């Protein structure tokens, strides 16, 4: 195999993958989904920007500074990267339960349970001489996962076996866990160096904290956090999309009764989804409380010693999961955007409420997703450029392109079977199928172009001959659109001089006839 053959084979593959995404019928919902998500995110930021500059004292420059000033300071940058990991894990913990239709609002409590269990075990139960040279962070992760899963199991048991609404039980457990955690910290592991105004635990030893995970990530807790977060994203995505277990979870989420009719043990899978969500909450606790420089279990975001709230991290995860529509990879994108807003607000000198404003707007636009999925803006562009009369021609064109892709996919499948049976004689980098596909595609495109031009000419000639040309404002607007369609269609034939001259002369003839009718 020569380098030229490899480049040619790779180039054909790229074209195939691009066409498959753009024209394949099986990728139709994916295309619409991506387009809808991008449009909604852009709209949410645009509306946020307009609202900010409309507020007295609001500055548009500060809004754009969210994405620039953040990286001027190393501390802000590290907090930003760690916050991305926190949001990703919180979003995954919520979304995994949502895959079976369960609204897990107890992520904050599960996270706090994991944190208090891990801190108590390491600071009070383990002997002070026990400081492993390597693997202490793994012990921390396991302890916090055990604590988080324990609370998740309680919520799951109440929901599945006692029919207690998971939202009610999780909210109650959130408060119970936070208050018990505060009592345990106050009684056993409180750091009194901060005085009475501040309320936090003793710091976790370096040997157990993600902040000092390894020589590579020493003093870079954000790196270990991102590694954990991205590994979790990949595992969750693979489980949900490529395993029988994942498909059963999504089936139950779509229809509990339908899944029961198929013979699925619904209780079992709902219970397992709670456990996996609890595992993710345990990982979240590890990142939140051991990946920063402080390495303490703090209550400063819930009122310190006067507990007045539960940690907002779990609720951030709910918002992110809803905005991302429970898709693991979208959760990453949304987490980055929200982290930009939350961490970048201070260096950009924006009001602290800006983050909540943008988040609320993004959630509102996320609610419009189902409407956007069925909104087809490109159809309006097609109608504008080739005319309403060619919409059927365009649909036929799309169907033929999809059929051509199906032909190539099937032929490639047969080709792979031949490779298995005859590895010595078969040309592994044969591009003949791709070349035939490209030839078929070119013929389909040429047919589409000629049909569009012919249909436009036929429709206007028929309108002239039947006397339907009226010097009205409506018809004059249609004629203006027709002139735009002429330019658009003729641009297709700029490399086909004969066809270009033919269609150009016919369009000019129609223009003269129509203008003559308008004069009458």
Swiss-Prot record:
Alphabetic keyword roster: Cell membrane, Membrane, Transmembrane, Transmembrane helix
This protein's name: Uncharacterized protein MG120
InterPro entries, per the entry: ABC_transp_permease
Pfam families: BPD_transp_2
Subcellular location: Cell membrane
Organism domain of life: Bacteria
Ranges that cross the membrane: 38-58, 84-104, 105-125, 138-158, 167-187, 220-240, 271-291, 318-338, 355-375
GO cellular component, one term: plasma membrane
Topology versus the membrane: Multi-pass membrane protein
Main localisation: membrane
Molecular-function annotations in GO: transmembrane transporter activity
């Amino acid at each position: 195999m020569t380098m030229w053959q490899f480049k040619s084979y790779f180039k054909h593959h790229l074209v195939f993958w691009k066409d498959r995404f753009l024209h394949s019928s099986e990728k139709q919902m994916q295309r619409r989904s991506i387009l809808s998500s991008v449009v909604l995110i852009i709209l949410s930021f645009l509306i946020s920007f307009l609202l900010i500059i409309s507020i007295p004292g609001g500055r548009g420059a500060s809004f754009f500074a969210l994405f620039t000033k953040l990286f001027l300071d190393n501390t802000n940058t590290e907090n930003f990267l760690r916050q991305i990991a926190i949001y990703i894990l919180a979003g995954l913990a919520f979304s995994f339960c949502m895959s079976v239709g369960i609204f897990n609002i107890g992520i904050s409590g599960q996270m706090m349970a994991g944190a208090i269990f891990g801190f108590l075990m390491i600071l009070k139960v383990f002997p002070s001489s026990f400081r492993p040279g390597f693997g202490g962070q793994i012990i921390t992760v396991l302890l916090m996962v055990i604590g988080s899963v324990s609370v998740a199991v309680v919520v799951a048991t109440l929901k599945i076996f006692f029919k207690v609404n998971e939202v009610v039980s999780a909210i109650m457990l959130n408060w119970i866990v936070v208050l018990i955690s505060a009592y345990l910290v106050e009684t056993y592991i409180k750091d009194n160096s901060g005085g009475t105004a501040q309320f936090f635990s003793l710091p976790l030893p370096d040997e157990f904290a993600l902040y000092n995970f390894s020589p590579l990530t020493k003093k870079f807790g954000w790196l270990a956090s991102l590694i954990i977060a991205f590994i979790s994203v990949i595992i969750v995505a693979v489980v949900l999309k490529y395993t029988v277990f994942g498909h059963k979870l999504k089936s139950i989420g779509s229809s509990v009764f339908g899944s029961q009719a198929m013979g699925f043990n619904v209780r079992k899978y709902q219970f397992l989804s709670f456990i996996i969500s609890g595992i993710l909450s345990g990982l979240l606790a590890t990142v939140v409380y051991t990946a920063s420089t402080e390495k303490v279990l703090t209550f400063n975001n819930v009122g310190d010693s006067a507990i007045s709230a539960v940690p907002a991290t779990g609720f951030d995860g709910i918002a992110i999961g809803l905005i991302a529509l429970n898709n693991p990879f979208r959760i990453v994108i949304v987490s980055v955007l929200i982290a930009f807003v939350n961490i970048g607000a201070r260096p950009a000198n924006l009001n602290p409420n800006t983050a909540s404003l943008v988040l609320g707007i993004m959630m509102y636009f996320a609610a419009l997703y189902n409407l956007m999925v069925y909104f087809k803006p490109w159809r309006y562009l097609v109608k504008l450029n080739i005319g309403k009369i060619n919409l059927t021609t365009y649909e036929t064109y799309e169907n033929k392109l999809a059929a051509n892709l199906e032909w190539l996919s099937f032929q490639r499948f047969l080709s792979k079977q031949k490779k298995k049976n005859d590895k010595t004689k078969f040309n592994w980098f044969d591009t003949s199928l791709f070349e035939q596909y490209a030839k078929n595609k070119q013929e389909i495109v040429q047919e589409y172009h000629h049909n569009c031009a012919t249909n436009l000419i036929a429709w206007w000639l028929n309108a002239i001959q039947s006397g339907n040309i009226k010097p009205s404002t409506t018809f004059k607007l249609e004629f203006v659109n027709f002139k735009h369609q002429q330019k658009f269609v003729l641009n297709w034939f700029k490399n086909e001089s004969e066809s270009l001259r033919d269609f150009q002369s016919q369009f000019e003839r129609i223009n003269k006839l129509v203008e003559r009718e308008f004069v009458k």
